[in-house]
From Swiss-Prot:
It is found in: Membrane. GO terms for biological process: citrate transport; determination of adult lifespan; pyruvate transport; succinate transport; transmembrane transport. It comes from Drosophila melanogaster (Fruit fly). It is a multi-pass membrane protein. One of its GO terms (cellular component) is plasma membrane. The chain crosses the membrane at residues 24-44, 64-84, 93-113, 135-155, 200-220, 249-269, 308-328, 350-370, 393-413, 430-450, 478-498, 515-535. Cation-independent electroneutral transporter (not associated with membrane depolarization) of a variety of tricarboxylic and dicarboxylic acid-cycle intermediates. There is also small, but detectable, transport of monocarboxylics. Transport is through the epithelium of the gut and across the plasma membranes of organs involved in intermediary metabolism and storage. Pfam families: Na_sulph_symp. GO terms for molecular function: citrate transmembrane transporter activity; pyruvate transmembrane transporter activity; succinate transmembrane transporter activity. It comes from the Eukaryota. This is Protein I'm not dead yet 2. Belongs to the SLC13A/DASS transporter (TC 2.A.47) family. NADC subfamily. Keywords: Membrane, Transmembrane, Transmembrane helix, Transport.
Length: 562
């Protein structure tokens, strides 16, 4: 029988293990309390704001509280500590940027609800071909395209069942080994088998492609919208407006097309035996190519099983195309956009997206009632569904992300109003004199590193406001630092926790972390290199003003007395 002292230690140990969040939620604010006390003693709002940011950062990193709940802290503490009025803080939780994000998610759900994504994927894969390498290229291409227009997590979630269906067909027809053997990776009884090297490439490929596609447009990922919101809030007099069009022109040529091409080539070499015909993987692929006709027949049959394109799918495809046109032509930059021609009031991207959202909730999936109206068919007693169901949206929208974005914008406003940004800028002046490429590399690698262990949007909310102030202190155009860092935050390929697509595929396909981390080494190096080249070459063409420190930035710097 255990001694009473030993039993107490055992109970205490179990309590610490299973109830650590409750203790940490008290300990973390106590650890940061000296910052707040100093703020009250010196009556410096900067340190009160610093306490709030540090406390929220620690709670976000440790996930002591749900990250979405932590994002609500500014609603309580900004007014309570006298940092910002409650009315101003509340407005940050439903800005134009957040409405754009919400609209993009709803349109993505409309595509999923109509099953349009499956038809697009199968069509593209059939065009590309049925060999394993061609299948991989097709899956990567579809994932990249979807990542451009819908959130990368939604795109990955849509692609996973498609990949699983293909993998099951490959396994059934014995085209190549899709799972590891017991000798290669032992599995406990009842556990699912681990995917083979080639199968890992399929799943990791769609995750990386979705993340890369998300770099291409403002609605592709939450970090892009965080960047736009923070940049607009901090630099309201900037002559460079971050529009859907110029962000797209900046990112797609190099950050998306070149980046994904290099990543595809890297995967084909490392995981599919390209240029290595005598390797084990190369021999497996060569043997699988002999069954290419069988795989093409399977794909064709799956495509035929979908049947002809329904009225539901056609309408959703038209709405999707119309959304793209509205977003690009709102303010393209080189010619007046439709928002300039309508009236003198500012019409943001949220207006165009909201119109599409209203449209897909209003239009029916089919128009059989016209037959009755024309006397050519019986009366349909049943109600006809809309293109998108509100109940489906309620179940599938990640509402917490809206709070996360709003919390970041509220912190940015608090930093500006209290002067914390000035204090941070002065601390960054040690970097004055370093070449731009060196400063960019430092900020990019740090942003990438922190994103490896935390949610992308959380890191963006913490890092981007600091880089805005750093750019003023170093007298660099803010886009030179903030834009590549924004992209770097999304290009984290090492760990499952780094991005939502990574987490989705590792859980869905039961991929071990060590295999997933190995996949991410080369794509990360490619991403960092392409981002730095893009910023200092193509980026200077799209944003020519970023070559020098602009007058409006000088005025902001003088006003803040950096």
């Amino acid at each position: 029988m255990a001694e009473p002292g030993e039993q107490r230690k055992f109970v205490l140990g179990r309590c610490c293990i299973f109830h650590w969040r409750g203790k940490a939620s008290i300990i973390i604010p106590l650890i940061t309390l000296p910052i707040l006390i100093y703020g009250f003693q010196t009556d410096m709002a900067e340190f009160k704001c610093l306490w709030l940011i540090v406390t929220m950062a620690l709670l976000w990193i440790t996930e002591t509280l749900p990250i979405y709940v932590t994002a609500l802290f500014p609603l309580v503490f900004c007014p309570l500590l006298g940092l910002v009025n409650a009315s101003i803080v509340c407005k940050q939780y439903f800005t134009d940027t957040i409405v754009v994000f919400l609209g993009g998610l709803i349109v993505a759900l409309g595509i999923e609800y109509s099953n349009l994504h499956t038809r697009i994927a199968l069509r593209v894969i059939r065009i590309v071909g049925g060999s394993p390498r061609r299948l991989f290229v097709g899956l990567m291409s579809v994932s990249t395209f979807m990542g451009l227009w819908i959130s990368n997590s939604a795109g990955t979630a849509m692609m996973c069942p498609i990949v699983k269906a293909l993998v099951n067909e490959l396994d059934t027809n014995k085209i190549f080994p899709v799972y590891m053997t017991q000798e290669e990776e032992p599995v406990e009884e009842g556990e699912p088998p681990h995917p083979s090297k080639i199968t890992v490439a399929f799943y990791a490929g769609i995750a990386y492609a979705s993340s890369i596609g998300g770099l291409g447009t403002l609605i592709g990922t939450g970090t892009n919208l965080v960047f736009r919101g923070i940049y607009t809030e901090r630099f309201p007099t900037s002559t460079v407006e971050i529009t859907f069009a110029n962000f797209m022109f900046y990112s797609i040529p190099l950050m998306v097309i070149v980046n994904v091409t290099l990543v595809i080539i890297a995967f084909l070499i490392t995981h599919m035996g390209l240029f290595r015909p005598n390797s084990k993987t190369g021999k497996i692929i060569a043997e699988a190519n002999t069954n290419r006709k069988l795989m093409e027949d399977v794909l064709r049959q799956r495509h035929i099983d979908l049947g002809p394109m329904s009225c539901h799918e056609i309408q959703m495809a038209i709405a999707f195309a119309f959304m793209i046109v509205l977003l690009i032509t709102r303010k393209p930059g080189f010619v007046p956009g439709w928002s300039d021609l309508i009236n003198r009031k500012v019409v943001g991207s949220a207006s165009g997206l909201s119109f599409i959202v209203l449209l897909i909730f209003a239009l029916p999936t089919q128009y059989t009632f016209f037959k009755y109206c024309c006397g050519k068919g019986p009366f349909t007693a049943q109600a006809i569904d809309a293109i998108l169901s509100w109940e489906y949206v309620l179940r599938n929208i990640p509402w917490g992300l809206l709070f996360l974005l709003g919390g970041g914008f509220a912190l940015a406003v608090a930093s500006r109003e209290t002067g914390l940004n000035i204090m941070i800028s002065k601390a960054m002046q040690v970097l004055i004199g370093l070449p731009n490429i060196v400063v960019q590399s430092i900020t990019f690698v740090l942003a990438n590193f922190f994103s490896a262990f935390n949610a992308n949007v959380v890191v963006a909310n913490i890092v981007l406001p600091i880089l805005c102030e750093m750019s003023l202190a170093l007298e660099l155009h803010p886009l030179i630092l903030t834009l590549p860092a924004c992209l770097g935050i999304s290009m984290v390929y090492f760990l499952p926790v780094s991005t939502p697509p990574n987490a989705i595929v590792t859980q869905y396909a039961h991929i071990k972390t060590k295999y997933f981390a190995c996949c991410g080494i080369v794509p990360t190096i490619i991403g960092i290199s392409v981002a730095l080249v893009n910023t200092n070459t193509w980026g200077l063409i799209i944003f020519p003003e970023s070559k020098s420190f602009p007058d409006w930035a000088k005025e902001i710097k003088n006003q803040t007395k950096i």
